[in-house]
Every structure is written in structure tokens, then in C-alpha cells.
């Protein structure tokens, strides 16, 4: 990239336009008469527009010189020729070349003003009805609205790409919504820091409107603690104190605004256990709905399955197994109960139990569905059970509502799943909102078996659902504890169970062939060792290719964090070479062959499978491989398991390298080999749950590199971050009232 400069010019043609995120490739004639290609975020670009763009020039072998724009300021066409080109491009719905000629011939330089505010004049054109005139005017004003939003964002140095989700949410009212309440930008859908929103609001003259600011601060604290901390609610006193600190004001000033929000039902206040709990309304509705549905399932006794004992014996005989007492109990309870929780660590026979339950249900003529929270977990579940398994989102028919910016599901109470039984694996990853959607999609009488390991890290989203369901004591639960003889030979399994009981793992064991510890206290040597393991030692000596190894670390920061490790691993495993395309984005260089990870939910990414099946949505934590980068560097083809998605270069902000990832991001996945960094890090991450989850990600081989004292400290530290949730309390309370 060259030095940053500013150019001015007129759009001649639109080579490419991504309607979802506003990314465009434009042919431009500059005010100096030069022809060039401009790439950047220019939503709804059209020929005839005048632009002032800030950015830098770069050169590509195939496409020549390009100008990559970081900021774009747009102006309406200023003469009749430019207006004609602009309207003839089709940028305004209902206006084609012929209509554009008639409009400009009639109104000349005033054409755009007529379209914006005097649509009744359009009926002077032959064949133009009053209704069509209003439709064309509305379409034009929609374009102007988007332009004004972009100008607003540019004025406050916010990315132009924000205009797309804003316009999706508010449509033609987007600018009015921002002018009415700039704090809406702090919503998690837009992700602007509250302090930035505060500065914008003050510059817009909102300094005197204390209630708007305090209400925004309160809802920000509730949503931020939900999204970042997993809290379903906050205690009233904690919410007031946190908001007062955020706004640098007295608690008394915040308290009235909280009561106002409660009065209009944007916040729900309710006694939960011994706490005065404050919920965002949606969180309260999710929690109470889950409780209501579970209470209904507990009250309902499904139709009895006859001959269960006989069928179990038949399955044992056919599969050549004999179920342990707890496994048999799990199968029997699945036949009797509408809701069953099945838990257990590695090697305790969860998979065998699930297979038995599936076989029993199918023998009894039930239609069985299998699902898991992530694509990798669903794929593994399907392979182990020799059945089709889907992600929960796909099973429920997830869709993204462009108007509200919300995720919705086609399956629900009005259109339930066609299933007599549903088995969900990795349930500890299911957050409260997804559990609500799942329960809503079950028809009355459908059996539900939730399988998981409550000792792993909780869901990324709000709540601690699986653990709360277990600890409520209301739901039939089978906890598999005994390690089977075959699994007992594995040091991975044995050490996982040691850690889970608070004992340090056995790091030195000459007889081990699947668990190794390499002491490295110096960070430079640690990184060198990790690179050596992944590049040569483990592929050569253990027969596990680098593509099937995963480096896990508790943290993103520091020498032993994902950032440093990914730089080192990319340089070793996928170095640059002639003919291999790459694209720089910030401090990262994305290269063909790189392993990458999606870092946020993007419901608009279009993907396709080899069989032609297509869909949308790539989610936070999905890992893929860059198969191809267009020579221009503007389009990337990424393969996520069996799905291929095309990314434009401005979408690279959603990606990170994935040679190394945090343990949290690895939840729900399993790898042939894992290299875990057991080095000192932030106290909040030096906990048993992180170590246990890391160990249980390894299927065939685990190598811990680091400091034995740090590993032992993690095993001993059972501190779990508290998540405010009323689910367990509500279920217990419901049981006491019966």
C-alpha cells in the first residue's frame, strides 16, 4: 500500500456491488481526467455520483492500479449529464434509462429536487400515474436516507459499513432515529463504544437531556453484561452502581431513569431468590418461557413405550455390547421421561448411551432428530451415531430479519419440528435464547434428551442453562462417572478426570503414548517448541498432519497468546511463495491455504455445498481454510467444512487466524491432536474449567507446553465466574409449589 492521499472524481460504472455490506468496485474518472478503479465501502453506488475519497494506491498484476478507499464522501450529480447517468443506472427503483431521459428532459437540473420533495410534479410526464410517482419518490428518498447516514458516520469518524445494518434496522427512518437518539449506536448490533456515543450526543446538543443519557447507560450496562459476561440479569444495586460509574454521575440520578424504564416495561424488575433482579425485557421473556415449557414437559407423561427391556437386550446382542447399569438407566429413563439430562466426562460412555437411546427410539417407531450447537459438534455426533445430525440453527430454520436485525426461526410453536424425539449434544454450549427457540419448536409429547458435560466452560451467550437445569434437581438426570476399561488406558481421559476432581494432571508418565508435557518457562523457547511440534515433530513421529493439530491457549494476549502464536505458526506452516495469493488487512496477511476463524455471527454470508445446497450464515467460532484469493485481493473463497463462502476484502475484519485459538473458541470441537499452552496468564483464565475443557478437546494426542506450576494451579482453582440467572431458582420454586 502507498501513502494515504485524497482523490475527487465521478463514478463511470459499478463493476461490483455487495448489497449486504456495501462493498463496491467502481470505475472512476478523476477531476484530473484520469481513469482508475476504486474499491471500498460505497453502498448503493451509481454512475454519475461525485466522490471525494481518502485512501491509498496499490498495484495488482491482473487488475493494474487500484485506489483502496478508507473514507468516501459522496455528492449528488451536479449537471444534467451526470443526473441522467445516475438515474439511468437503475439505482432508483422504478427508473430506467427511458424514464430517466424523460425526467431530465422535463425538469433538468431540478430533477433530483423534484424526486425528493415534489413528486406530484412527476405526473406531468406522459404515462406517469400519481401512485408510480409516489413510489419513485419513496425509492429516491431511500437512497438519500442511506447517503445521509453515511455522511453522519463519516462526520464522526465511524466506518461507512455501519450504514448497512443501520438502514436494515430503521429503513428510511435511520437518520431520524440517529438524530433522535445517537446512543442507539451502542447496541450490540452496531458495536460502537458507549463513550463514543456519549461524545456524539454531546456534540449534537444532547447534554441537557439527562434522562436519554441515563436510560441509554442503563440499557447498555444490561446488554453489555449479557453479551460479555453471560448475565441474564443484574442485581438492581449493581446495575445502578455500574451505570453511575459509566456516566460519572450520582446513583440517585440513575435510579429515577431505571424506574421509568421499568414503568414502560423496557426493563423488568423481579425478586429472584434474595436479589432484586433487573432484566432486559427480552432476557426476562426468554427465561420465563424456558421455565414454562420445562414445567409443562415435567407435568406431561409421554406415551409408554412397550417392551423396552426386550428391545434393550436385542440391541445389546446385535451390537455385541453389555450396557453398564447407569447406561441402561439412561436408556430406560429416555423411554419413560419427556425430558432427560445425560452428563459425563470423557470415557464414561456417553456416546454408547446416546447410540442406545437412538436405537431404542427408532425400534419403537419414533422419528428421531440429532442436533448440536456447532457445525463441528454436529458433524462429530453424526459420525459417532451413524445418522444425520444438524446444527440447532439449521434444524430450526434460522433466518435473519433485515428490518429488525434480529435472528428468527421458521420452526416454532406454529410450525414445530416433525420429530417424536430430539437428542442434543454439547448442551453446555446452548445459551438461554437458543434454548428458548429449541423448546418452542418441540411439539407436545416430543421427547428431549440433553447431553453434555457441565464441567466444561459455559456458553458464550447469556445463561448457564445446562448446569442450571441439572442443579435445579427437578429433571431426570443420569450422570455417567465410571471410566470404561478401554478409555482408562488413555492418559488424556485419566488426566481429565484428575483435573475435574481438583487434582493436578500426571505430567510425567513414561508409559503414556497420548499425553506429554514439555516444560518451557521461557516464552521464546515456548513458541519455538510449539512451532516445531506442529511443523515436524508431531506429523513425523505421531503421524498427525498439521491440518489435524490445533494449538489452544487460555488467552489472546501476551507471548503465549493467540496473536503471537498465530504469527509464528503462519510463518512456519504457510509461508509466502510465488503464485500464492495474499491480502493484507491491518496487521494480518491472509494467504491462500491459511486456517482462519470467523469472529462474529454474520447471518448474511452466502455459502454453497458441493451438491448445490446453498444457505446463509457463518458463525462466531467457525473455522475454515482460504482456498482462493482473487488476484485483485478483493475476493476470497473460504471453505468451512463442507461449505464454501465468498468474502469481500472489507469482510476480513470478521476473520482471524486460527492456527492457535483460545480454549473458549474451541468449545464443541474435537481434534486428533491438541497442543495446549500451560503458561501463566490472567488470573480469571487460570482456572480448572479452562484446563479441563482444553484436555477434553484432544481425541488421540495432547501435548502441554509450558510451566508445570501454572498447570497445577489451574487444576486446583475451581473458581467459576458467577452468572446472574434465575432459571435454577424458578424451577426449584416451581417444584416447591407443587
Where are these predicted regions, by residue range?
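Hydrophobic positions on the alpha1 helix immediately C-terminal to the Walker A/P-loop
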Residues: 353, 357
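Conserved lysine of the Walker
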Residues: 350
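Accessory, non-ATPase domains that flank or precede helicase/AAA+ motor cores in DNA-metabolism machines
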Residues: 1-307, 316, 738
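Conserved helicase motor core of SF1/SF2 NTP-dependent helicases
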Residues: 360, 364-366, 372-384, 393-401, ...
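Hydrophobic anchor at the beta1->P-loop junction of P-loop NTPases
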Residues: 342, 370
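C-terminal accessory regions
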Residues: 613, 620-738
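Conserved helicase motor core of P-loop NTPases
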Residues: 454-616, 627, 734
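N-terminal pre-P-loop "Q-motif" helix
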Residues: 320-336
Amino acid at each position: 500500500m502507498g501513502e494515504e492521499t485524497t482523490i475527487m472524481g465521478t463514478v463511470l460504472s459499478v463493476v461490483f456491488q455487495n448489497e449486504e455490506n456495501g462493498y463496491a468496485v467502481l470505475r472512476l474518472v478523476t477531476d484530473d481526467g484520469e481513469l482508475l478503479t476504486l474499491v471500498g465501502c460505497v453502498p448503493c453506488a451509481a454512475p454519475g455520483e461525485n466522490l471525494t475519497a481518502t485512501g491509498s494506491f496499490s498495484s495488482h498484476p491482473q487488475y493494474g492500479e487500484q485506489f483502496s478507499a478508507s473514507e468516501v464522501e459522496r455528492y449528488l450529480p451536479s449537471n444534467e449529464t451526470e443526473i441522467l447517468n445516475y438515474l439511468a443506472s437503475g439505482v432508483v427503483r422504478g427508473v430506467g434509462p427511458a424514464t430517466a431521459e424523460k425526467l431530465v428532459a422535463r425538469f433538468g437540473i431540478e430533477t433530483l429536487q423534484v424526486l425528493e420533495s415534489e413528486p406530484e410534479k412527476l405526473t406531468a410526464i406522459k404515462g406517469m400515474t400519481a401512485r408510480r410517482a409516489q413510489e419513485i419518490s419513496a425509492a429516491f428518498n431511500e437512497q438519500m436516507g442511506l447517503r445521509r447516514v453515511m455522511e453522519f458516520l463519516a462526520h464522526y469518524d465511524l466506518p461507512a459499513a455501519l450504514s448497512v445494518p443501520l438502514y436494515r434496522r430503521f429503513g428510511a427512518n435511520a437518520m431520524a432515529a440517529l438524530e433522535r437518539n445517537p446512543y442507539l449506536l451502542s447496541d450490540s448490533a452496531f458495536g460502537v463504544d458507549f463513550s463514543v456515543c456519549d461524545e456524539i450526543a454531546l456534540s449534537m446538543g444532547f447534554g441537557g437531556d439527562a434522562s436519554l443519557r441515563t436510560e441509554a447507560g442503563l440499557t447498555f450496562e444490561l446488554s453489555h453484561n449479557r453479551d460479555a459476561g453471560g448475565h441474564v440479569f443484574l442485581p438492581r444495586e449493581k446495575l445502578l452502581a455500574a451505570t453511575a460509574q459509566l456516566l460519572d454521575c450520582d446513583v440517585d440520578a440513575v435510579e429515577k431513569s431505571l424506574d421509568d424504564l421499568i414503568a414502560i416495561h423496557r426493563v423488568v424488575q423481579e425478586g429472584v431468590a434474595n436479589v432484586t433482579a433487573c432484566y432486559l425485557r427480552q432476557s426476562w421473556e426468554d427465561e420465563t418461557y424456558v421455565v414454562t415449557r420445562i414445567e409443562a414437559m415435567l407435568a406431561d407423561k409421554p406415551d409408554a413405550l412397550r417392551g423396552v427391556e426386550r428391545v434393550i437386550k436385542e440391541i445389546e446382542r446385535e451390537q455385541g455390547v453389555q450396557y453398564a447399569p447407569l447406561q441402561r438407566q439412561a436408556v430406560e429413563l429416555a423411554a419413560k421421561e419427556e425430558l432427560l439430562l445425560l452428563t459425563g466426562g470423557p470415557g464414561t460412555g456417553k456416546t454408547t448411551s446416546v447410540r442406545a437411546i437412538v436405537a431404542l427410539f427408532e425400534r419403537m417407531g419414533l422419528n428421531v432428530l440429532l442436533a448440536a450447537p456447532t457445525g463441528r459438534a454436529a458433524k462429530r455426533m453424526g459420525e459417532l451415531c451413524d445418522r444425520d445430525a444438524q446444527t440447532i440453527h439449521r434444524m430450526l430454520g434460522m433466518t435473519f430479519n433485515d428490518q429488525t436485525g434480529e435472528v428468527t426461526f421458521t420452526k416454532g410453536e406454529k410450525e414445530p419440528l416433525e420429530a417424536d424425539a430430539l437428542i442434543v449434544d454439547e448442551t453446555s454450549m446452548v445459551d438461554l435464547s437458543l434454548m428458548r427457540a429449541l423448546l418452542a419448536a418441540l411439539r407436545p409429547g416430543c421427547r428431549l434428551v440433553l447431553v453434555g458435560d457441565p464441567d466444561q466452560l459455559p456458553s458464550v451467550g447469556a445463561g448457564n442453562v445446562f448446569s442450571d437445569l441439572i442443579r435445579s434437581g427437578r429433571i431426570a438426570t443420569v450422570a455417567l462417572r465410571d471410566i470404561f476399561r478401554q478409555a482408562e488406558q488413555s492418559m488424556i481421559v485419566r488426566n481429565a478426570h484428575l483435573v475435574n476432581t481438583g487434582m493436578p494432571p500426571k505430567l510425567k508418565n513414561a508409559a503414556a503414548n497420548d499425553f506429554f508435557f514439555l516444560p518451557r518457562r521461557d516464552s521464546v523457547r515456548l513458541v519455538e517448541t510449539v512451532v516445531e511440534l506442529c511443523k515436524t515433530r508431531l506429523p513425523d513421529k505421531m503421524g498427525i498432519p498439521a491440518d489435524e493439530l490445533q494449538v489452544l491457549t487460555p488467552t489472546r494476549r501476551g507471548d503465549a497468546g493467540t496473536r503471537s502464536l498465530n504469527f509464528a505458526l503462519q510463518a512456519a506452516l504457510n509461508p509466502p511463495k510465488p503464485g500464492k495469493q495474499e491480502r493484507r488487512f491491518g496487521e494480518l496477511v491472509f494467504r491462500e491455504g491459511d486456517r482462519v476463524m470467523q469472529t462474529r455471527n454474520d447471518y448474511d454470508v452466502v455459502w454453497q455445498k458441493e451438491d448445490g445446497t446453498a444457505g446463509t450464515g457463518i458463525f462466531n467460532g467457525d473455522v475454515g481454510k482460504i482456498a482462493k484469493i482473487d488476484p485483485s485481493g478483493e475476493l476470497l473463497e473460504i471453505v468451512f467444512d463442507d461449505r464454501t463462502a465468498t468474502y469481500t476484502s472489507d469482510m476480513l475484519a470478521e476473520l482471524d487466524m486460527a492456527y492457535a485459538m483460545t480454549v473458549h473458541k474451541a468449545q464443541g470441537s474435537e481434534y486428533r491432536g491438541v497442543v495446549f499452552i500451560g503458561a501463566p496468564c490472567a488470573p480469571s483464565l487460570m482456572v480448572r474449567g479452562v484446563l479441563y475443557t482444553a484436555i477434553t478437546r484432544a481425541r488421540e494426542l495432547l501435548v502441554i507446553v509450558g510451566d508445570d506450576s501454572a498447570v497445577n494451579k489451574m487444576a486446583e482453582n475451581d473458581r467459576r465466574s458467577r452468572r446472574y440467572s434465575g432459571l435454577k431458582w424458578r424451577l426449584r420454586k416451581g417444584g416447591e409449589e407443587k
